[in-house]
Amino acid sequence: MLAWQVIGLLSCAACSSTSTEPAGGGDEFAVARARLVDGLRAQGITDPRVLNAMALVPREEFVRSEDRPQAYRDQALPIAGGQTISQPYIVALMTQVLELHGNERVLEVGTGSGLQAAVLSVLVREVYSIEIDPQLAAAAEHRLRALGYRNVRVRAGDGYYGWPEAAPFDAVIVTAAAAKIPQPLIAQLKPGGRLVMPLAKDDGQTLIRADKQEDGLRIVPVTAVAFVPMTGAVETPTP
């Protein structure tokens, strides 16, 4: 019940209506993509700009070739390096919770296959995406460029430290779970900015949104989730 209440609270009422007709005409993937978007709408994804982005991004290009027939099932799928591409509903939900309007600069931690970056690319001015696995980062950068997402920059590195030379950011999205929000990411978030990420506790993971205010962070829980753990410096205990 909490998830639906919070989704309603954080839905983007200010977003303008746009078409959700997917690119690609009548091919089978376009039909499946449109059906997926209808399902997302039924699950509480109400921001028309997010629905439009989900309708435009070809998820089949971001999964393994053997998984292309399952590309538009609402489920996570494996990718290289023991990682996963997130469930479409979670991609849409995290994007909606950020309340993006179009002129933002967004930092993504955990590029993976590049799907979330592609969705953000449709919605914002600039996307900076960091991936700790160099092979995944290189593959995602090549894939995004080949598909025409020109406002996305990808680099290999430890997302714990963010991308300081490109900061500050209007929004930060973290696609791996950690016990607490990395301090460098908070520092690189603009005042009034939003961060969304899964936080891990002993009893499971909770997707949260953190708003950076003058007196600190306002954290709102969204829903229970299951993400791969964040790796790198975040694993080192703080003295």
Predicted regions and their residues:
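SAM/dcSAM-binding transferase cores
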Residues: 16-24, 31-32, 169, 187, ...
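Conserved alpha-helix/loop element of class I SAM-dependent methyltransferases that forms part
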Residues: 34-38, 42, 74, 85-104
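Active-site/binding-pocket entry motifs
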Residues: 60, 69, 78, 216, ...
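Bacterial N-terminal signal peptides
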Residues: 1-13
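Conserved nucleotide-cofactor-binding alpha/beta core module
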Residues: 99-217
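N-terminal auxiliary segments of SAM/dcSAM-dependent transferases
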Residues: 15-66
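Short, surface-exposed glycine/acidic/tryptophan-bearing loops
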Residues: 62-80, 84-85
